[in-house]
């Protein structure tokens, strides 16, 4: 249970999750430099160059589990080809994905072309101070990141809020410019009263 609540950083809750990460990803913990900041994690993977370092980030905490659940909210059950539980989509899936990718690359002896940082806050769900503490640590080290990849996006295949079929969520935040081409086909209508099937 890694739920977080407004204005309360319950670091002890996350220590168990950190142990699971150590067991599942031994090479990450052996080969990368780990810094723990009040339950928040920062890993440093030395690359061939320190120019243009990148940061992969996501959060460990989840919102409280309320209501009825098909599977226990903290079970991580695998059923019907899916992982069920809090954090399966928001967003321990990202944490596990980047740890798994790095673990496999380390096993192959891969050295990234530039320095890579992995960061995971434990207070994101209530806008806490986890990410700012990680930023402060990076600033203390004099790190100027070239690219930050945070949670979000992806192709959603499950119905959400009455939307059926596959759809992609695109989120961009940068200084500069991004060109996105988007095509939707539908009968005309007005945004205030969209007809059924409007993309």
Labelled PLM ranges:
Residues 38, 51, 71, 113, ...:
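Short, solvent-exposed loop/turn segments at the edges of secondary structure
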Residues 42, 179-183:
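Beta-strand secondary-structure signal
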Residues 83, 89-169:
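Acidic/histidine-rich catalytic neighborhood of metal-dependent amide-processing enzymes
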Residues 1-4, 184-188:
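Short, histidine-centered active-site or binding-site loop motifs used for metal coordination
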């Amino acid at each position: 249970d890694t739920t977080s609540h407004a204005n309360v950083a319950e670091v002890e809750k996350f220590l168990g999750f950190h142990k699971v990460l150590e067991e599942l990803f031994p090479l990450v913990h052996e080969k990368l430099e780990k810094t723990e900041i009040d339950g928040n994690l920062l890993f440093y993977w030395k690359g061939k160059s320190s120019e243009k370092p990148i940061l992969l980030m996501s959060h460990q905490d989840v919102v409280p589990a309320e209501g009825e659940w098909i599977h226990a909210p903290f079970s991580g059950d695998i059923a019907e080809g899916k992982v069920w539980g809090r954090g399966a989509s928001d967003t321990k899936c990202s944490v596990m994905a980047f740890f798994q990718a790095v673990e496999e690359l380390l096993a192959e002896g891969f050295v990234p072309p530039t320095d890579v940082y992995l960061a995971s806050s434990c207070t994101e769900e209530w806008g806490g101070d986890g990410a700012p503490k990680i930023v402060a640590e990076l600033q203390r080290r004099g790190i100027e990141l070239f690219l930050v990849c945070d949670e979000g996006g992806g192709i959603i295949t499950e119905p959400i809020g009455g939307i059926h079929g596959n759809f992609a969520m695109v989120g961009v935040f940068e200084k500069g410019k991004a060109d996105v081409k988007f095509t939707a086909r539908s009968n005309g209508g007005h945004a205030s009263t969209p007809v059924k099937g409007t993309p």
